[in-house]
Amino acid sequence: MQREYDYIIIGAGSAGNVLAARLTEDPGVSVLLLEAGGPDYRLDFRTQMPAALAFPLQGRRYNWAYETEPEPHMDNRRMECGRGKGLGGSSLINGMCYIRGNALDFDHWAKRPGLEDWGYRDVLPYFRKAETRDIGANDYHGGEGPVSVATPKNDNNVLFQAMVDAGVQAGYPRTDDLNGYQQEGFGPMDRTVTPQGRRASTARGYLDMAKPRDSLHIVTHATTDRILFAGKRAVGVHYLVGNSSEGIDAHARREVLVCAGAIASPQLLQRSGVGAPDLLRALDVQLVHDLPGVGQNLQDHLEVYMQYACTKPVSLYPALQWWNQPAIGAEWLFAGTGTGASNQFEAGGFIRTREEFDWPNIQYHFLPVAINYNGSNAVKEHGFQAHVGSMRTPSRGRVHARSRDPRQHPSILFNYQSTDQDWQEFRDAIRITREIIAQPALDPYRGREISPSADCKTDAELDAFVRARAETAYHPSCSCAMGTDDMAVVDGQGRVHGMEGLRVIDASIMPRIITGNLNATTIMIAEKIVDRIRGRAPLPRSTADYYVAGDAPVRR
C-alpha cells in the first residue's frame, strides 16, 4: 500500500470530505483520507431517512457519544455531546437544518486582525458554490454545488405555517428565507435533503464525486493516534486500523489537514504535542509547540423544548406508532416522499430579545410533535414544540485530552450558563415563546403547556427548568480558534501558528459561534480554505445586500 501522499486529511466529516473532493480535482495530487468510523451505508435508514434523525444518536455505530464533565451550572449533569462517526461525520447524523448564520456573524469575524477576508460578502460565494437548492439559484443561493438543499413546500404540516404566523402576530418580522437577505424573523427552514428524499451528507455530495479518482485513498475505521513532526513541520500521521494496536505511518509531502471536529481536533493536537505545556506534561507528551489556545474557547448552543398538547389530530404523533411506520418507510424507500423524507424542522426563526443585540440572539426550530431531539421521552398524545435557545453565549469551555490513548474520550466542559446574560436570555426566550404560542394563529391547535408547564413562572422556576432540562443543540465549535491573539490556534487560512505543513479546518476554527446551525458554515469554511491550499484566487466578493437591524425595534 502506498504510504506517501501529497495531503493527509484526518476526519471524513463536513469539512474533510470537501477538502478530499476539491484537492483531488487537481491532476497528480494524491490524498489519504482517514476516518475513524465506518462507511455511510446507503441502505441504513437510520442515517439516510431524514425523519429517522434521532436514531443515530441512540447508538455508537455513527455517534462518538461523548459526555461532558459534570456541568457546574446545570445541576452538575453530565450532558450529551454527540458527534458523527463515519463517512460524512456529523453531517451523517445531524438534524439536516440548512442554516448559515447571520451576515453580521461574519462581518464581526472580519473585524478581528488577520481575518479581514471573512466578511459576509467574502464567504457568501462559497456558501453558493457548495449548494444546489431545489428551487434554483439566486444572489444568495447556488444551483450547481455538491450539497442538495430542499425547501419546505406548501403541502407540509399545517402547524409549520401556524407557528410562523404566530411569530409574526406577536410582532416579529416575517422572512421568506432564513439564509437570504434577512435572517431575522420567522419563516420556512431549508434542509440538506436530496430530491430523492435522502440525507445530503458531505459523503453523498462530495465523496461520491471524488471516489472514482485513483488519487484519493479512503481508509475507514482508521483512528489517528498522533501527527508526526520533523521539528516544527508536520510530515505525516501514525494511525490504527480497527482494533489493532499495530500502527501505520503515512507521510505527507505537502500538508496534514486536521478535520476531526471541535472535540477531536484539539484532542489530537494535544496528543501530538501541540498545546498548553502544563497539560502536555500531565499527559507525558513531549512538547512540540507551546500553543495555549488549543482546546480553549469551546462554545455550543443550549436549548430547551417548549412542548404543547395539540387539540386537533394534525401532529406527527401517529408516525411514532410502530404500526404506522412500515407504510411511512415504504413510501420513503420507493418514492422518496412522505413523512420519512423530511427532518420535520421545516419552520423556525431568529429574533432579538432586547434592543441591545445588534442581530438575533435567539433561534427557534418548530417541530410538529412533542419529543426529545434524540428520540427519547415522546409525549403520548398529539403535540408540538418549539426548540428555543441563545445563540452567542459569553460562556466558554474547554477540551482536554485525558491520556495518550487515541481511543479514550477527552475531558469536555462547556461551562454552560456560567454568566448572568445566559440566564437572562433563557428567561426572555421562554416568556416570549409563551407569547408567540398564545397568538390567534395557534388557537385551533393549542392545548395545555406540557413542558415546562404553565405554573413555571418566576425567574427562579424558569432557571430551575433550564438547569434540569436544557440540552445541547449539538453545535460544539471554536476550540482551535482563528485569529492572531495569544489564544488563537490558526490563522485565517487554517494554518497552525508556529508550525509548518499543518492546518485545522473544521468548526473548531470559528473564532466565535455563529447564529444558527453549524454544518453549512463548516462546509463553507472548507470550500474557502481549500482554494487557498490549491493556490487559487478567492472567488469574487458578492455584491448582494443584506439586512442590518440598526435602530429597528425588536418587535412591531
From Swiss-Prot:
Catalyses which reaction(s): choline + A = betaine aldehyde + AH2; betaine aldehyde + NAD(+) + H2O = glycine betaine + NADH + 2 H(+)
Gene3D superfamilies cross-referenced by the UniProt entry: FAD/NAD(P)-binding domain, Glucose Oxidase, domain 3
Pathway: Amine and polyamine biosynthesis; betaine biosynthesis via choline pathway; betaine aldehyde from choline (cytochrome c reductase route): step 1/1
Binding site for FAD: 6-35
InterPro entries: BetA, FAD/NAD-bd_sf, GMC_OxRdtase, GMC_OxRdtase_N, GMC_OxRtase_C
Location of the active site: 475
Keywords, comma-separated and alphabetical: FAD, Flavoprotein, NAD, Oxidoreductase
GO biological process assignments: glycine betaine biosynthetic process from choline
Top-rank taxon: Bacteria
Keyword Nucleus: no
Annotated Gene Ontology cellular component terms: membrane
Keyword flag Mitochondrion: no
Known cofactor(s): FAD
EC assignment: 1.1.99.1, 1.2.1.8
EC category name: oxidoreductase
GO molecular function: betaine-aldehyde dehydrogenase (NAD+) activity; choline dehydrogenase activity; flavin adenine dinucleotide binding
Family: Belongs to the GMC oxidoreductase family.
HAMAP family: Choline_dehydrogen
Functional description taken from the UniProt entry: Involved in the biosynthesis of the osmoprotectant glycine betaine. Catalyzes the oxidation of choline to betaine aldehyde and betaine aldehyde to glycine betaine at the same rate.
Protein's UniProt name: Oxygen-dependent choline dehydrogenase
GN (gene name): betA
